[in-house]
Amino acid sequence: MNYLVMISFALLLMKGVESVRDAYIAKPENCVYECGITQDCNKLCTENGAESGYCQWGGKYGNACWCIKLPDSVPIRVPGKCQR
């Protein structure tokens, strides 16, 4: 029984776990992608591995793309200034 648990744990570690999060997708300089229509955001988000996306109007960063289930490997807007 212990062998089964250890093998399962080892397989989990070898495979790795890809987590996802809902967030504003960001440009390399920590700026959001501004938007006007949801279709543009949905395309941007899904091209970057998210499940979907939409244009969030009047949010914390103005009209910006919000992605749902965005992979950890894609940059998101973090607190701090946009470095344009």
UniProtKB/Swiss-Prot annotation:
Q: Which PROSITE patterns match?
A: LCN_CSAB
Q: Which residues cross the membrane?
A: none
Q: Where is the signal peptide?
A: 1-19
- Proregion span(s): 84
Q: Keyword annotations for this protein?
A: Disulfide bond, Ion channel impairing toxin, Neurotoxin, Secreted, Signal, Toxin, Voltage-gated sodium channel impairing toxin
Q: List the disulfide bonds.
A: C31-C82, C35-C55, C41-C65, C45-C67
Query: Record's domain comment?
Result: Has the structural arrangement of an alpha-helix connected to antiparallel beta-sheets by disulfide bonds (CS-alpha/beta).
**Subcellular localization, as worded in the UniProt entry:** Secreted
Question: What protein am I looking at?
Answer: Neurotoxin BmK-M10
Function (record text): Binds to voltage-dependent sodium channels (Nav) and voltage-dependent delayed rectifier potassium channels and inhibits the inactivation of the activated channels, thereby blocking neuronal transmission. Administration to mice at a dosage of 0.8 mg/kg produces an analgesic effect.
GO cellular component terms, alphabetically, are: extracellular region
Q: Where is the LCN-type CS-alpha/beta domain?
A: 21-83
The primary site where this protein sits is secreted
Q: In which tissues is it expressed?
A: Expressed by the venom gland.
What InterPro entries does this protein map onto? LCN-type_CS_alpha_beta_dom, Scorpion_toxin-like, Scorpion_toxin-like_sf, Scorpion_toxinL, Scorpion_toxinL/defensin
Protein family (similarity comment): Belongs to the long (4 C-C) scorpion toxin superfamily. Sodium channel inhibitor family. Alpha subfamily.
